[in-house]
């Protein structure tokens, strides 16, 4: 995961920042239960996964708490948009040598929020090292897929899966405050 941010102190102990995060690989696992067909055949239980790539754009409010010795704890709350891209994948049924489940490549913007805690240690008055733990939640991530129609032995569109995905994020970084 790669992240960058730029912010502005709007009041003592309160700052706003714009952050952009790129998450190159998030694996979404799926499990297809076995299915008994009318003609006595059985599609076996299948476990698979697809890859999700996301770009997260957030507007955050950061509140610095009272110093504890030389450390400054802080709280982060934010909201924004996540661009989610689901990679295509499929599962094959060896008996008929055909795909019976296929995830489509999709791309969608999702409403996102995050909340977190962090701690900063100042190295100089303008430079600090930070450690953060955040929870990011993206709503209504859409996964489009096809399933096998046994009458036509063709893949047919199925109802989309809409999931809320939450990701825990831990980070270490530096903050440089421009002296104005």
UniProtKB/Swiss-Prot annotation:
| Name assigned to this protein | Uncharacterized protein RP788
Native species: Rickettsia prowazekii (strain Madrid E)
Source organism phylogeny: Bacteria, Pseudomonadati, Pseudomonadota, Alphaproteobacteria, Rickettsiales
């Amino acid at each position: 995961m790669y992240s960058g941010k730029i912010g502005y102190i709007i009041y003592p102990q309160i700052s706003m920042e714009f952050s952009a995060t790129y998450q190159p690989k998030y694996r979404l696992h799926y499990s297809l239960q076995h299915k008994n067909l009318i003609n006595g055949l059985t599609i076996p239980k299948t476990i698979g996964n697809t890859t999700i790539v996301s770009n997260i754009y957030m507007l955050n409010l950061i509140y610095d708490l009272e110093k504890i010795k030389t450390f400054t704890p802080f709280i982060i709350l934010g909201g924004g948009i996540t661009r989610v891209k689901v990679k295509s994948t499929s599962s094959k049924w060896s008996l008929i040598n055909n795909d019976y489940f296929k995830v489509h490549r999709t791309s969608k913007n999702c409403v996102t929020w995050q909340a977190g805690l962090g701690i900063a240690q100042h190295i100089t008055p303008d430079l600090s090292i930070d450690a953060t733990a955040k929870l990011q939640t993206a709503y209504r991530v859409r996964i489009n897929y096809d399933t096998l129609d046994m009458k036509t032995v063709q893949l047919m569109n199925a109802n989309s899966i809409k999931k809320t995905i939450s990701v825990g994020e831990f980070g270490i970084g530096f903050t440089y405050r421009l002296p104005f």
